[in-house]
Amino acid sequence: MDKLNKITVPASQKLRQLQKMVHDIKNNEGGIMDKIKKLKVKGPPSVPRRDYALDNPADEEEQWSDDFDSDYENPDEHSDSEMYVMPAEETGDDSYEPPPAEQQTRVVHPALPFTRGEYVDNRSSQRHSPPFSKTLPSKPSWPSAKARLASTLPAPNSLQKPQVPPKPKDLLEDEADYVVPVEDNDENYIHPRESSPLPAEKAPTVNRSTKPNSSSKHVSPPGTVAGRNSGVWDSKSSLPAAPSPLPRAGKKTATPLKTTPVPSLQNASNVCEEKPVPAERHRGSSHRQDTVQSPVFPPTQKPVLQKPVPLPRFTEGGSPAADGPVPSFPFNSTFADQEAELHGKPWYAGACDRKSAEEALHRSNKDGSFLIRKSSGHDSKQPYTLVAFFNKRVYNIPVRFIEATKQYALGKKKNGEEYFGSVVEIIKNHQHNPLVLIDSQNNTKDSTRLKYAVKVS
């Protein structure tokens, strides 16, 4: 029925409905369809102008797709490409003249090398101005290097052209104070130079020549005086003392060294050998050298006192040449008494050697058998040796003589050892008290009493 009603609707109503629809469509032109059209028409926003030229502008167009949904405008579509001028097109080699071409037309300004060598010392060695004028043309290459770098950079001519010319202008302003050594102006340039280098050459030469000569002349005589005064000192202290102390000593060393030579000729050779170190330490001042040399005279008597002192030391060391006379004087009484006391004892073998003494003890083959014999080394510190037998072994124990206390002791020096007034007291003590026997090979200790006296046949 609804369909029939719709069909039967009068034509006037249908017209009205159509008019309303058309009117609504016209009013909705700014609606969705209009927005869709704008989206299709609009491109990405314009890009700010770049300071460099693109190699292939077509490549940039390919980067933006048609479906790009943002509000970014494409600069190729909206911007006037014809009005935009690329810097590469404008800065052509034909229209732009590099700065070195302008400077080559000008006169070469040699102010740059003269700023370096403006000092008088450098000018004095090279008086002639022509060599400087020959070397000056090498400097124009300096601005040309910067011009090459400037040409590679993509910058407008308005920025580059004002940068290049002010540099030579500044140089010309600085050069106004100086005279350029051109061939035409050589005469005007040489006159002030001739007056200035002459005093500059004389001043250093005079000062440098006089200072070392004056110091060497004044210092050399004291060195020779010191060498003549002491013969031994020349070989030891002359070499290190020559470079540094002599210029420091100066004029003061001349007078004190002259006063000391006469007495030092006799004994300086012996004394200077003992004390070279203080002389080297105080070689800087003349007064310290006097203090070193002045006490040298009294010690000349000290070596006389020290000479007899080492003699008994050599005798104590056991030198055979000194043992003969020296121990005989203090020990005549003691050794004579010992020999008299030991001569009648049954256990004293006298000047028996070690082998025969050991054989005699092995023949006895009794633990505690013993004898006393003279030491084979004939040492004043070890005059006798105690030979004991225990556990089928023979022990040779040295009997030491202590000079300070005139006493005897057994074995090597050790803490808490016993001292005896004679060899007989040693035998009597160990006949009642055990004697410690140390085997150095097996590192063992045994003890026994001296029981059986053995005679060597």
UniProtKB/Swiss-Prot annotation:
The keyword Cell wall biogenesis/degradation does not apply. Residues 272-290 have a biased composition (Basic and acidic residues). Keywords: B-cell activation, Cell membrane, Cytoplasm, Membrane, Phosphoprotein, SH2 domain. GO terms for biological process: B cell activation; B cell receptor signaling pathway; cell surface receptor protein tyrosine kinase signaling pathway; intracellular signal transduction; positive regulation of gene expression. CDD domains: SH2_BLNK_SLP-76 (cd09929). Residues 206-218, 256-270 have a biased composition (Polar residues). PANTHER family: B-CELL LINKER PROTEIN (PTHR14098:SF3), SH2 DOMAIN CONTAINING PROTEIN (PTHR14098). Associates with PLCG1, VAV1 and NCK1 in a B-cell antigen receptor-dependent fashion. Interacts with VAV3, PLCG2 and GRB2. Interacts through its SH2 domain with CD79A. Interacts (via SH2 domain) with SYK; phosphorylated and activated by SYK. Interacts (via SH2 domain) with SCIMP; this interaction is dependent on phosphorylation of SCIMP 'Tyr-120'. This is B-cell linker protein. It comes from Rattus norvegicus (Rat). The lineage of its organism: Eukaryota, Metazoa, Chordata, Craniata, Vertebrata. The gene is Blnk.
